[in-house]
Amino acid sequence: MKTPNLVDARKRNCDRVNIIRNFKIDSDLKRIGKNKKYVVKTYGCQMNERDSENICAILEEMGFIRGIDIEDADLVLLNTCAIRENAHNKVFGMLGRLKHIKESRPLLIGLCGCMAQEEVVVDEIMSRHKYVDFVFGTHNIHELPNILGRAIDNNKQEIEVWSKEGDIVEDIPIKRENKYKAWVNIMYGCDKFCTYCIVPYTRGKQRSRLKEDILREVEELVNDGYKEVTLLGQNVNAYGKDIEGYNYNMANLLSDVAKTGIERIKFVTSHPWDFTDDMISVIRDNPNVLPYIHLPVQSGSNRILKLMGRKYTRESYLELVHKLKENIPNICLTTDIIVGFPNETDEDFNDTLSIVRECEYDSAYTFIYSPRVGTPAAKMEDNISLETKEKRLQELNDLVNYYSRKSNNRTQRRLKQLSKFNHQY
């Protein structure tokens, strides 16, 4: 049994990250799922969706058949998100449903993903949810066959969560959810340590895949008829910075992916601090790199940005946005915004509203601040009432929706003009 430790998870070192290839499942584990149905329920971000594609493929190599409904599944695995309390509540609510099912028939229940990397979650699983059969984290998906095998053979709760990130494991099988659009991991982890964010603890230090492996994956997708790839990472703009002597960055990678012949390229998520002029040039000069930029601002207040540890100012963010809009025609700009961060004043919130007005985002993901155990922000005094936070969120959403409607109307007019042109010629 191995349980998570957030103190260890925070530590960073300069140890070289090894690349492990030729993933294999032991022959005796390839039969344990024969004639059994599995269901994987995924919560959270695109990284989790991509992880679930690996998990599903591993289970099918072990003989399991994909099911649709948890009511008739033999194995249910929850791939979880730790970014907000709401995600926690959904998962524990689902565990309650699964417990009820398990009381009437055999059922294997597993939990993985970012929640599994949290001490408080695993402690609760061990003490109050003993019906959960196995738990593993974000760093050891490739160990799923062995973990599941032990859980079945030993008939007791199997917990194997690595606090520290491991090697990069290539060649894990994948079951793509879409025949035309694909997720492609380019890196794992994050070293930014924003004060409110649990991700650097749950996903580990930044580790970039080698360009050769990324480009090979994209080329295979092109050959298989895929039309669109989304390059994934917690902070894709920092790609390559973790590899010593690696003179190759996100702009270089975007340029090379564009040359593979894939028709459409997206990337998420970008941190404003690492967005370079070279990246802007590559997006501008390559038509198959879509002019879609997700650029989380989180707050428009310099005071709050500093408390968040975001490492940029309102002014530098706006300078970047203006540069993007000047260089990339028809850019679609989206963002993330948190309201109700500890001790956010009316003035701070008004700064956020004003940056929305200046940027005119096409869309935004907006949230009330959710404290995460183990992060610095969770220890900050919070004197803002829930009523105030909810009122601010509604006011922000009204403004965001106003600019979203403007964006939709512009798009509609362009489509009508294009349709009229095509009809004439």
Residue ranges and their predicted role:
Residues 338-341, 412-416:
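A glycine-rich phosphate-binding loop feature that marks nucleotide/adenosyl-phosphate handling sites
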